[in-house]
C-alpha cells in the first residue's frame, strides 16, 4: 500500500511538472468597467481575477469586484462581490463567460425628503444611515481578446443579476450592466 502511494504521488508530481513546462497563458487579470443599473444610473467597477488553470479553451477563475453606482435623487450603492466561474475562449478571440458568487451591498439613501416624527409629535428631517444587503450574484458575459506578447487586452460586456436579501422582508432581483476592459497578464 505504501509503495503504491509513493508511485501514485510520483506520477502526479511528474505529470504536473510536464504540464507546467509549456507556455502558460495569463495567470491574473484586472478590469476597470462602467457599472450601471441601466444606462441612467452610472457607476464604476474595479476587479481582480485569478485563473486557476492553464487551458487555453476554458479558463476557470475566481474574481473579486468593488464598485458603486449613483441613482440620481435616490441612492448611492457601494458593493463588494466574490465570484467564481468559467470562460470559454474561441480561437477567433471571442469569449463567453458565466459566474456565480456572493457579495455585500451598502445602499445610502439620499437625504432630501427623509423625515420622521419625534416623540413630542414634531416632524424633523432624518439623516441617512443606509441599508445593507447580501446579494447572490449570477452573470454572463461576452468579449474579445486582443493578444500582445506580454498581455491580453479584452473589452467585455457583462449583465449582472443580483438577488438581494433582505429587501422589505423578501428577496429582490436587480440587474446591472458592466462594460469595460479586462487586462490579463502572467
Residue spans of the language-model regions?
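Bacterial Sec-dependent N-terminal signal peptides
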Residues: 1-26, 185
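Histidine- and/or cysteine-centered catalytic micro-motif in compact active-site loops
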Residues: 3, 65-67, 101-103
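Short coil turns and loop connectors of transmembrane beta-barrels in diderm outer membranes
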Residues: 3, 26, 54-58, 90-94, ...
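Short glycine/proline- and aromatic-enriched beta-strand/turn motifs that initiate or cap beta-hairpins
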Residues: 20-69, 184-186
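Residues that define the transmembrane beta-barrel architecture of outer-membrane proteins
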Residues: 26-28, 40-44, 58-60, 76-80, ...
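Sequence/structural signature of outer-membrane beta-barrel proteins
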Residues: 35, 39, 51, 55, ...
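Transmembrane beta-barrel strand/turn architecture of Gram-negative outer membrane proteins
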Residues: 63-66, 77-89
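Outer-membrane beta-barrel transmembrane domain signature
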Residues: 85-186
Amino acid at each position: 500500500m505504501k509503495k503504491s502511494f509513493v508511485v501514485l504521488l510520483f506520477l502526479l508530481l511528474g505529470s504536473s511538472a510536464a504540464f507546467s513546462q509549456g507556455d502558460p497563458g495569463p495567470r491574473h487579470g484586472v478590469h476597470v468597467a462602467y457599472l450601471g443599473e441601466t444606462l441612467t444610473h452610472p457607476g464604476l467597477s474595479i476587479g481582480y481575477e485569478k485563473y486557476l488553470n492553464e487551458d487555453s479553451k476554458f479558463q476557470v477563475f475566481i474574481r473579486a469586484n468593488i464598485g458603486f453606482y449613483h441613482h440620481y435623487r435616490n441612492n448611492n450603492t457601494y458593493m463588494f462581490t466574490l465570484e467564481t466561474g468559467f470562460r470559454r475562449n474561441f480561437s477567433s478571440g471571442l469569449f463567453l463567460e458565466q459566474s456565480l458568487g456572493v457579495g455585500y451591498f451598502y445602499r445610502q439613501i439620499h437625504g432630501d425628503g427623509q423625515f420622521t416624527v419625534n416623540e413630542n409629535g414634531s416632524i424633523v428631517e432624518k439623516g441617512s444611515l443606509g441599508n445593507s444587503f447580501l446579494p447572490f450574484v449570477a452573470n454572463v458575459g461576452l468579449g474579445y481578446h486582443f493578444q500582445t506578447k506580454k498581455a491580453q487586452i479584452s473589452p467585455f460586456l457583462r449583465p449582472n443579476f443580483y438577488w438581494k436579501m433582505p429587501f422589505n422582508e423578501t428577496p429582490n432581483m436587480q440587474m446591472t450592466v458592466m462594460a469595460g476592459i479586462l487586462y490579463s497578464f502572467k
